[in-house]
């Protein structure tokens, strides 16, 4: 049985509801040899075998149980002006904003009413503004990086990421609306809606970033071996622009 066939079989076991810890323990030796590209190809195979794309999206978090974090290794060998290094840097900054959002939300949830002098509301508006402005990050992925995977026949993983971008955008804009309209809202209603948005964004965006760092980006680096392509992607990246983070070059 080929490596991809074995890995597809493992993913099918996860789809059937088996404990990912048990599956990983049973296949530990084999899983130590898989690459992010192997996982991306196996996910594509599941789609070709009839798996609903929505189900693949649910499974992606379980698939991460099979991988070690690739971020540090990529940052070690990529030049700082490489498009993947830039995207990784933007991810780091976005994660910092998520940490701030978590802290600010917890503080606001303890309040008994809107107090405009409290710094938490200014911080919430700043965080929401920065997250909305991170649209340029998604644009670079959707217009530049994902098409490179699709050129090599990998449509499933980028499709899942695009769908998540749509959900993330909707909730980021909702957060921005709440931050701008808190003074006009019933405060209890504001607290409920804020907590719901944060409860969605925090795990969704963190998992999304982890999957891109550990499946999408490493797979793109493995598949695209033409330096001229990466040079052109960097030029296109400059054309689109940057959010939260700018490269040195």
Feature locations, PLM:
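Small-residue-biased structural context
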Residues: 1-135, 139-249
């Amino acid at each position: 049985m080929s490596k991809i066939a074995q890995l597809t079989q493992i993913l099918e076991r996860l789809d059937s509801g088996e404990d990912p810890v048990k599956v990983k323990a049973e296949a530990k030796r084999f899983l130590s040899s898989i690459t992010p590209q192997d996982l991306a190809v196996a996910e594509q195979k599941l789609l070709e075998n009839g798996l609903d794309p929505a189900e693949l999206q649910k499974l992606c978090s379980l698939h991460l149980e099979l991988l070690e974090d690739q971020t540090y290794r990529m940052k070690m060998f990529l030049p700082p002006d490489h498009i993947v290094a830039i995207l990784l840097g933007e991810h780091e900054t976005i994660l910092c904003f998520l940490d701030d959002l978590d802290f600010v939300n917890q503080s606001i949830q303890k309040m008994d009413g809107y107090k405009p002098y409290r710094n938490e509301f200014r911080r919430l508006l700043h965080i929401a503004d920065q997250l909305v402005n991170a649209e340029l990050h998604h644009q670079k992925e959707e217009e530049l990086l994902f098409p490179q995977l699709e050129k090599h026949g990998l449509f499933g993983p980028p499709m899942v990421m695009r769908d998540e971008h749509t959900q993330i955008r909707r909730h980021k804009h909702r957060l921005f609306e709440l931050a701008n309209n808190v003074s006009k809202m019933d405060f209890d209603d504001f607290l409920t809606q804020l907590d719901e948005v944060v409860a969605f964004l925090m795990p969704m965006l963190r998992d999304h970033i982890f999957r891109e760092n550990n499946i999408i980006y490493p797979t793109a680096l493995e598949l695209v071996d033409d330096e001229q392509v990466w040079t052109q992607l960097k030029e296109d990246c400059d054309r689109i622009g940057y959010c939260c983070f700018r490269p040195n070059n």
